């Protein structure tokens, strides 16, 4: 959460915006009404939560107990596991970022997943697809760099990472995704907001 806090503060500063407050809670907290009350009293008109499934669910339950209906966004944290089961119907209000979503059961990669893991019966059984796509694409990028380097030597692979191009992943085709000054292969255009609808992660139009 702390690294996200720094990034969010920079983003607010860049836009000349102020925040109503920053509150913290532990992963095993079951009541965050006091923190949320302070934010509400400070005039917060929306919330951004950085937490994983269970603690985010507790935030939603606390909001329900307060009767505070406020827009809430998050990083990828709520996308995994049993979020809507833990948070209840109000969990569908949370908008979170994703890099990839399965929206078609005929998707070739989804079909392969079903063949590999028979317990996957519907699109709702894959939460989140982002985790699969990120890992799959990262593996392809490393493989391309190893092939380019002609070696499994670490420094050689690192240098080859700056030269790879045309790697077709699930999220996108990567053309020169890395430079010495930019180690992130994904940019703002590669993210989308989504939310749960009846257990399935759906993109927000």
Model regions: which residues?
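Extracytosolic ligand-binding ectodomains
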Residues: 1-205
């Amino acid at each position: 959460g702390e690294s996200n806090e720094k990034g969010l503060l920079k983003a607010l500063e860049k836009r000349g915006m102020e925040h109503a407050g920053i509150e913290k809670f532990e992963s095993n907290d079951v009541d965050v009404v006091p923190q949320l009350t302070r934010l509400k009293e400070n005039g917060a008109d929306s919330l951004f939560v950085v937490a994983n499934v269970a603690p985010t669910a507790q935030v939603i339950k606390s909001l329900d107990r307060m009767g505070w209906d406020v827009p809430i966004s998050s990083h990828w944290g709520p996308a995994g596991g049993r979020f809507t089961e833990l948070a209840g119907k109000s969990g569908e209000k949370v908008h979170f970022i994703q890099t990839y979503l399965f929206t078609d059961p005929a998707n070739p990669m989804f079909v392969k997943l079903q063949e590999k893991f028979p317990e996957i019966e519907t699109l709702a059984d894959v939460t989140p697809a982002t985790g699969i796509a990120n890992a799959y694409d990262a593996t392809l990028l490393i493989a391309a760099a190893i092939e380019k380097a002609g070696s499994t030597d670490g420094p050689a692979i690192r240098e080859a990472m700056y030269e790879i191009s045309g790697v077709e992943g699930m999220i996108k085709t990567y053309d020169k995704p890395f430079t010495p000054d930019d180690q992130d292969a994904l940019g703002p255009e590669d993210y989308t907001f989504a939310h749960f609808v009846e257990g399935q992660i759906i993109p927000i139009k």
